[in-house]
Regions:
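Structural motif corresponding to the intra-repeat A-B loop/turn of tetratricopeptide repeats
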Residues: 2, 36, 45, 79-80, ...
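Canonical positions in the second alpha-helix
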Residues: 15, 57-58, 91-92, 108
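Terminal, low-structured helical/coil segments at or just beyond the last alpha-helical repeat
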Residues: 78, 94-131
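Helix-start (N-cap) detector for alpha-helical repeat units in TPR-like alpha-solenoids
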Residues: 23-24, 66-67, 83, 99, ...
């Protein structure tokens, strides 16, 4: 799988150079990078972080893009950032109105720094669910 992901990186980078504001291209590149970064190690930590940066860029362009949050949870999980991975899953499930959003939001809130953007978003998710 990593070999296929490696082959996808360069074409996505070329496409993004032509269309930098295309969320689906950013998500596709991030997905390839996350597959490459799944092997672990210090070098792959940087690859995973780069993937998360692309996903954040995609979400700035399309804040309700569920697949971006799903990929982000994978990236944060690979980095060992479990609370952030749970937050991303809460966002993913909340966007679809799925009841799993509550469980992931509750897990996230325990580990996120109070006052962080992700903490505030998680509180918002829980508030919306409780209504």
């Amino acid at each position: 799988e990593t070999g296929l992901a490696d082959k996808g990186i360069a074409p996505y980078e070329k496409a993004i150079a032509l269309r930098p504001n295309e969320p689906l291209l950013l998500i596709g590149l991030a997905s390839c990078l996350l597959s490459k970064g799944a092997a672990g190690g210090a070098a792959n930590q940087a690859v995973n972080q780069k993937a998360i940066d692309h996903l954040r860029a995609a979400l700035r362009l399309d804040p309700l893009n569920g697949p971006a949050y799903l990929q982000m949870s994978k990236g944060y999980g690979q980095l060992g950032e479990i609370a952030l991975a749970q937050w991303a899953l809460a966002e993913y499930y909340a966007a679809g109105g799925h009841p799993e959003a509550r469980r992931h939001a509750r897990r996230a809130i325990e580990g996120l720094p109070k006052g962080s953007v992700e903490y505030i978003r998680t509180v918002d998710i829980l508030s919306a669910i409780e209504r």
